[in-house]
Amino acid sequence: RKNKFRVRWYGNKYIIKNPILEIKKKNGWINEKILISLKPKIPLKINNKDAIIFLEKEINNKLNLNKKIIPVVSTHYLRKYFVSEKSLIRITIDRFVQSGEFFRYNFVNTNVDLNNIVLEMKYEKKYDDYVKNQLDHNYIISKNSKFINSLFYSSHKVKI
């Protein structure tokens, strides 16, 4: 089991507006998400050191863990959403994946295009066989993490 923490917001990648702390609990191929609203009084600029320190403090106060959560990388992409006719399967396609990193709370925009398109299919486990039997493709199905890919391109050497 692994827990992954991230702050998610939509719109301008440089302005953190209406951020949500997302805790993603993974157990093999099964994921669970917990969403916690963060409420800064004003939108925060990603390239403002004081704003990032403020956000870090708010997150750590809400989590109350033994370890401190710190900003490491920021991943941005253009996402399209699709839903099956009966709404049993959701598909997302992420393109133009870019990554930047935080160095001493300063955001360094690396503008790395990770040169891939990520297609994710999301559905309840009970539909697993159905989905696999319906797919007609020559692609390898694998796990993918834009976060892990971003770390690979960053200067951070973090134990994963």
Residue ranges and their predicted role:
Residues 1-160:
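Phosphate-end processing signature that detects enzymes handling 5′-triphosphorylated RNA
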